[in-house]
């Protein structure tokens, strides 16, 4: 059974995540004190039910040792997994402005910006040990729920999930990436007027990139690097490996290469997901 701990900065989507987990069959508890986690797990052990618990800055223990002690006191039938949700500072400020809700640290007479920054520092011990970090900055409520359903179902099966995501450097580097590869040095279809409106998912763009030896070399060397270290990553109690491929705009080269890598590892029986940040952003 799984004890899913959901944490993250206020406004990043913890309530949405908890509802998605409830839909998946988890027994969900909102804002349970950390010291009560072992007691909850023991209560549910006989019922053979996985649980999900949200922890925010208000019920964080004063020292990381308290959290570690709670984790070590869990029944052996439960496997703890930590999901950390985050979003960039401007997105969090906008969400608070839209909802007009008070930040949990507002009682300390802090400005919203200062409260967000202090909360980030207080939650760092949880963020640093998270099994999965999800950046919700560009996600709608429905997109976040669907993404969690897709990823967490793979996680519950205790199989490492490889996530290949394309992005554009001009939009920023994804904060959930384990590895980031820069492909801006490769030939750019953008400069061909016929290819410019297309994406790396279109056959003419794929044919353009497929003609270049350096593209093949990059794909081969990148997948070889990942294959070399994948066995160690799989035995390191890791459930996700997020590989981000970036080009200038996130539309052509990064999309094509992310798909090529995803197809390669999928053909070898790995649990693989792919996403394209710039293309998803254009749909909204």
Curated annotation (Swiss-Prot):
A GO term, aspect molecular function: GTP binding
Region entry RNA-binding, spans: 266-284
Binding site for GTP: 56-59
Keyword set includes Nucleotide-binding: yes
InterPro entries in alphabetical order: P-loop_NTPase (IPR027417), RapZ-like (IPR005337), RapZ-like_N (IPR053930), RapZ_C (IPR053931)
Chain sites annotated for binding ATP: 8-15
Coiled-coil residues: none
UniProt KW keywords: ATP-binding, GTP-binding, Nucleotide-binding, RNA-binding
Record bears the keyword RNA-binding: yes
Family, per entry: Belongs to the RapZ-like family. RapZ subfamily.
Function in brief: Modulates the synthesis of GlmS, by affecting the processing and stability of the regulatory small RNA GlmZ. When glucosamine-6-phosphate (GlcN6P) concentrations are high in the cell, RapZ binds GlmZ and targets it to cleavage by RNase E. Consequently, GlmZ is inactivated and unable to activate GlmS synthesis. Under low GlcN6P concentrations, RapZ is sequestered and inactivated by an other regulatory small RNA, GlmY, preventing GlmZ degradation and leading to synthesis of GlmS.
Xref: HAMAP family: RapZ_like
Cross-referenced PANTHER family: RNASE ADAPTER PROTEIN RAPZ
Subunit structure: Homotrimer.
UniProt name for this protein: RNase adapter protein RapZ
Taxonomic path: Bacteria, Pseudomonadati, Pseudomonadota, Gammaproteobacteria, Enterobacterales
């Amino acid at each position: 059974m799984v004890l899913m701990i959901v944490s993250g900065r206020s406004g990043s989507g913890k309530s949405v995540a908890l509802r998605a987990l409830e839909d998946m069959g988890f027994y969900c508890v909102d804002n349970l004190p950390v010291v009560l986690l072992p007691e909850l797990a023991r209560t549910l052990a006989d019922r053979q039910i996985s649980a999900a618990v949200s922890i925010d800055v208000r019920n964080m223990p004063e020292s990381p040792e308290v959290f570690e002690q709670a984790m070590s006191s869990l029944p052996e039938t439960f496997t703890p997994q930590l999901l950390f949700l985050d979003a960039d500072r401007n997105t969090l400020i906008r969400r608070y402005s839209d909802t007009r809700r008070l930040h949990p640290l507002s009682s300390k007479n802090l400005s919203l910006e200062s409260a967000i920054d202090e909360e980030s520092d207080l939650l760092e011990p949880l963020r640093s040990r998270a099994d999965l970090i999800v950046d919700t900055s560009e996600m709608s409520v429905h997109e976040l729920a669907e993404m969690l359903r897709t990823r967490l179902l793979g996680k519950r099966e205790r199989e490492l999930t490889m996530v290949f995501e394309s992005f554009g450097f001009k939009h920023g580097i994804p904060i959930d990436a384990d590895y980031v590869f820069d492909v801006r040095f490769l030939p750019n279809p953008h400069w061909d007027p016929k290819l410019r409106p297309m994406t790396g998912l279109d056959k003419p763009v794929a044919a353009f990139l497929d003609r270049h030896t350096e593209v093949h070399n990059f794909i081969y060397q990148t997948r070889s690097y990942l294959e070399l270290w994948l066995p160690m990553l799989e035995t390191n109690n890791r459930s996700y490996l997020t590989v981000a491929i970036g080009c200038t705009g996130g539309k052509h080269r990064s999309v094509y290469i992310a798909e090529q890598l995803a197809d390669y590892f999928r053909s070898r029986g790995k649990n693989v997901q792919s996403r394209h940040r710039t293309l998803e952003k254009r749909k909204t």
